[in-house]
Regions:
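Signature of extracytoplasmic/envelope-associated structural regions
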Residues: 2-245
């Protein structure tokens, strides 16, 4: 039978689930599930002050205050739903708002323009729209009336798209509050078997700082979520739970 003196090792990353917070402060319906995390870090910090006195003005009594718990999640993959939650494109219930649209703007580098057709990089032929306002030529020697045959030009067109998902980021919307539960495994020193372990955070605030890195070299981009743990309406700020399946 397990005791509080049993020791365990931790190596595996967490799988994380975000939940709505109900009106009575309990954990509600799931909003987002993450099972592709690379790193999941829970950090607790606090400030400290002490009463000093006597010879050498040494510390006599110490107080801790301003406790903060933060969580950092580094995800190898993203979805439209996870980006919407990270950037604050959510409704009143904290659910992601991802719109659909039928048209998108594309700018192409054009090597030839002839009879309304252009040859795109990669050999794909594309017919330019003829409606006024849908094509804009950026090269000085190319216009809609006298296209010519420039060495290169940039043409911006409105095209019909497929399976488009659009995330609108407004100046007055920010990421919301959620409950968060992280699931992982810890390994017993005695048996060598893995046992289930949970980090339960009844109330966290998704931080607004988001960095989206697009680069040609190096490792694939990861997507970071930074959470600040808040005090819930009832109960502790965080629970660490070991259990057997």
């Amino acid at each position: 039978m397990a005791t509080i003196l049993d020791r365990y090792g931790v190596k595996e990353v967490m799988d994380g689930t975000f939940y709505q917070i109900t009106e009575d402060g309990n954990i509600g319906a799931p909003v987002l599930y993450l099972d592709s995390l690379k790193v999941s870090t829970v950090e607790q910090t606090a400030e400290n002050t002490s009463a000093r006195g006597g010879k050498g003005n040494v510390e006599l009594v110490s107080w801790d205050f301003n406790k903060e718990i933060t969580v950092t999640l580094e995800d190898a993959l993203f979805s439209a739903k996870s980006l919407a939650i990270m950037y604050g494109s959510v409704n009143a219930n904290g659910e992601a708002v991802v719109d659909t649209t039928e048209t998108i703007y594309r700018t192409f580098r054009v090597d030839q323009i002839e009879n309304g057709k252009v040859q795109l990089r990669g050999g794909k032929e594309f017919t330019l729209p003829t409606e006024e306002g849908k094509v804009k030529y950026y090269a000085a020697d190319v216009t809609a009336s006298t296209q010519g045959a420039p060495e290169a030009a940039y043409v911006t067109v409105v095209v019909d798209g497929k399976s488009i998902q659009e995330i609108d980021i407004s100046p007055d919307t920010f990421p919301g509050n959620y409950a968060f539960v992280g699931d992982t495994y810890i390994r017993s020193e005695i048996t060598g078997r893995d046992e289930a372990f949970q980090v339960i955070l009844p109330k966290v605030k998704m931080q607004s700082e988001v960095t989206l890195t697009l680069e040609a070299d190096g490792d694939p981009t990861t997507f970071n979520m930074n959470l600040k743990v808040l005090r819930p309406a009832k109960g502790p700020m965080m629970k660490l739970v070991k259990y057997d399946l």
